[in-house]
Design a protein with these regions (language model features):
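Residues lining hydrophobic/aromatic ligand-binding pockets adjacent to catalytic sites
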Residues: 1-186
């Protein structure tokens, strides 16, 4: 079995989808600390002012205190973040971006549901985008897996422990992550 593991992201980059497409099982990695400056609840899009390179889209979170696990991060639904994101994305309509209407339809389909947590949004949006892209998604959530946390001494050990739990024959990761892994342990 080929396994891959990633933290949840807001509309992730292409490498995320490549991992899912090339895995037999994908793990939503939610058992580490949330980082408010990460891509978990924000992303970059083009800015309507051509003199500016980009703008952020994001959804607000309620509890982003230092030490909060990703699995515990809740969304602040009192703010109208869905409407704001859809409004920000109109920059692509003005640029006559191909597939704009299809993409907005997909995002609106994702936004129909109410989400209480960052993780629930990430899972549901990933499922719907995979369906749109015709990518099979078989997933687990790290916080729901009974894997050996005692062997974890560094960042690369999480994947090793989860891989052992599933008797994985191969673990794949994006290129940028190779620095945290000790090949001799795999």
């Amino acid at each position: 079995m080929i396994l891959s593991i990633m933290q949840p992201y807001l509309f992730p980059y292409i490498g995320y989808w490549q991992l899912i497409a090339n895995s037999d099982k994908f793990i939503f990695f939610d058992v580490v600390q949330y980082n408010k400056k990460s891509w978990m609840n924000r992303n970059k899009i083009l800015h309507p002012d051509k003199s500016k390179e980009f703008q952020y889209i994001s959804f607000p979170v309620k509890n982003n205190l230092q030490g909060t696990l990703i699995s515990a991060v809740t969304l602040n639904n009192e703010e109208k973040w869905k409407e704001k994101i859809l409004g920000q994305l109109t920059v692509y309509k003005s640029l006559k971006a191909p597939y704009y209407n299809e993409t907005i339809d997909l995002i609106q389909n994702i936004f129909i549901q109410d989400y209480q947590t960052l993780l629930s949004f990430s899972i549901e949006s990933t499922k719907k985008i995979c369906q749109y892209l015709d990518i099979e998604l078989k997933y687990e959530i790290a916080s729901e897996i009974d894997f050996d946390r005692k062997i974890i001494e560094g960042p690369g050990d999480w994947a090793l422990s989860i891989s052992k739990e599933f008797n994985t024959s191969e673990y794949i990761n994006l290129y940028g992550g190779y620095k945290i892994f000790d090949e001799t342990k795999y």
